[in-house]
From Swiss-Prot:
ATP binds at K198, E315, G341, G342, D343, T344. One of its GO terms (biological process) is gluconeogenesis. Keywords: ATP-binding, Cytoplasm, Glycolysis, Kinase, Nucleotide-binding, Transferase. Belongs to the phosphoglycerate kinase family. GO terms for molecular function: ADP binding; ATP binding; phosphoglycerate kinase activity. This is Phosphoglycerate kinase. Monomer. Pathway: Carbohydrate degradation; glycolysis; pyruvate from D-glyceraldehyde 3-phosphate: step 2/5. GO terms for cellular component: cytosol. It comes from the Bacteria. HAMAP family: Phosphoglyc_kinase.
Amino acid sequence: MNLRKMTELNITGKKILIRTDLNVPIKNGVIQSDARILAALPTIEIAIEKKAKIIILSHLGRPKEGCYTKKYSLFPIFEYLKKKLKKTKIYFSDNHLKKVEINSGEILILENVRFNVGELKNDENLSKEYANLCDIFVMDAFGSAHRMQSSTYGIGKFVKIACAGPLLISEINNLKKALKNPKRPMVAIVGGAKVSTKFNVLNKLAAISDTIIVGGGIANTFLAIDNKIGKSLHEPKFILKAKKLRDKYNNIVIPIDSRVGKNFSHKEKCTIKLSSNIEKNEEIMDLGDKTIKKIIKILKKSKTILWNGPVGVFEFPNFRKGTEMIAKAIAENNGFSIAGGGDTLSVIDMFQIKDKISYISTGGGAFLEFIEGKKLPAMKMLEENFHK
């Protein structure tokens, strides 16, 4: 990669604009999970130590562009960081055009970039306004690296120096570790609702993995190739594509038994049945015990594990066993494990295995697009800026 790295630049006394990912769940002004903030902190702390003048940009949620909405404000994150970085002076501004002077080693947090008209459409004028705020732009938001927006892409055209932050570099290096010359056997676990959103990822992973395990609605679409699956969530239009993929690689583990229920409900009781024996009024909501046992056996032997998505409706107590047992098997594995995607992070939090996964990615869409082999717009921007 031909790009600049923040750690290789002299940032002392310079105004640096860090585009980070502080898109955390907030309920009634209270942060529900600080995982992304904690991931972003080391970069901020390096900048403080180097006595840079630090300006922070981030998005939060999906507000209506141009409209301030309190529930999407970064103010709770500003308050969180004030408590976390007690020795550092931190300021907050609700307008990126409002001039706020800060000294070396101080931080200015700007309001949610998605309140700014033109952010999502990569508006040139907004990109210029961001560029005018700094001497150096630091792209550190891997979770937004797949978005061609003003604060993640457009700014690179107008800022003199754009560089990659330590978190972004770490994300890329760890994904490459899993995807290029992984220690074998390599196992990929892909769960979630829709094959359609992850088909290209499945195709890529099936080609490079020794075994690929599918779960959730994705597994149901594979099951529907040869079985009647009642009212289970699946995508009929993708059954033929799933069949071609299965037949081409012959390394996809499809559930031999499943936990089923008659109603999609938190209190629904489960029955374990062979996946070939599902009734019309039943829906598959988790893996069965035989399948779980088979998967755990595979995971015990693996040296590299890439994990994206739960394998069942883990939010329902009676349908979380598959996801829980797989999560714990990954945690007990001594090889290299990497996990990514919003629901995957929720599972990791639920079963308290954060410290037992080798690397937890902050990316969802970016994580999947990188696996697919797509060039992420943020990486393209950094390379173009390097050659300016």
